[in-house]
Amino acid sequence: MKIHEYQGKDILRQFGVPVPRGIPAFTVQEAVEAAQKLGGPVWVVKAQIHAGGRGKGGGVQLAKTIDEVRRLAGSMLGMQLKTHQTGPEGQKVRRLYIEEGADIGKEYYLSIVTDRATQKLAFIASSEGGMDIEEVKRAKPEMIITEFVDPLAGLGPEQALKIAVGIGLPAPAQAQAQAVDIMRRLYQCYMDTDASLLEINPLNCDGQNRLTALDAKFNFDANALWRHPEIVAYRDFEEEDPAEVLASKFDLAYISMDGNIGCLVNGAGLAMATMDTIKLFGGAPANFLDVGGGATAEKVTEAFKIMLGNPKVKGILVNIFGGIMRCDTIATGVISACKAVNLSVPLVVRMKGTNEEPGKKLLAESGLPIIAADTMADAAQRIVAAVR
């Protein structure tokens, strides 16, 4: 789950991480009132969307007068902000964050992610803050350092100091001591909130060697949200794909993609293999959709409705391996779904495993124009051919 920058900064404040003062605004008038409350002489007007690269897209701008705040707020609210993370369609700006201006000095990058390979937390840092870290990795990989932290031991002061020195934070004891303190607070924040990503870009060091987090990006582990109702309250459904939100209500794992072949599969691994096979034979998947091991006829019907809600879908591939899941249950769901949505696009079904033969019999006797396939490769080839 993602949250907005201003919400992330609320969390950082709770953990004692220094951030500029700021106030969220949903209207132009609220933006003006926020600037007046904060006081001048400079404000930063920030569009709030769940995507990076806002500055390059015109979503982060300085204002030196209240009239400028009003003008910028009026132009940003409602705009389709396009960044390298939004795609060509952009994302609509519905919220702003009005923040006090900062004395910009040297900018650094800090982030924490979980590294599955080492089974540790990776503390990633760079002296090239304020830039896209992927761009830094490509152009100046030597400017990025990674320190692995054992979650059983935690981030000790010696590791934090090693990171601070490694990215060239200024030598005065005050600055390095503050850097160590901030990193340890960020680590505690990451652990206590069950985050899967915590990114500060940039961490600003001003002319007096004071450090401030000028941006905050969080992702949270969806499997741990049940114990964080305060974080769930931050969720902004308007920033999410409506199809993905609807799918979550039926316990379906759904992610939209850019192709034209809908995929309904049980199991994340099989779903990814299915999409790869479609690509191998020249097709393009329109979605990732895992119905899980406890799918019912109702869930299958809802899955079909969600897939067909995408106008780009020109065909559907159902690929089921019946272990816990019974193939006849899926077949019943597929038949019900076809009738419920009045299916008008090609449908290929491949089923193997538990109750495979009864499932195939149900499909064959349904009277529906379902294309049967025996292997995953056969299924992929058939659906790719059908949508051409």
UniProtKB/Swiss-Prot annotation:
Disulfide cysteine pairs (residue numbers): none
Annotated keywords: ATP-binding, Ligase, Magnesium, Metal-binding, Nucleotide-binding, Tricarboxylic acid cycle
Regions crossing the membrane: none
InterPro entries per record: ATP-grasp, ATP-grasp_succ-CoA_synth-type, ATP_grasp_subdomain_1, Succ-CoA_synthase_bsu_CS, SUCC_ACL_C, Succ_CoA_ligase-like_bsu, Succinyl-CoA_synth-like
Positions bound to substrate: N266, G323, I324, M325
An annotated GO cellular component: cytosol
Name of the protein in its database record: Succinate--CoA ligase [ADP-forming] subunit beta
Native species: Verminephrobacter eiseniae (strain EF01-2)
Gene designation: sucC
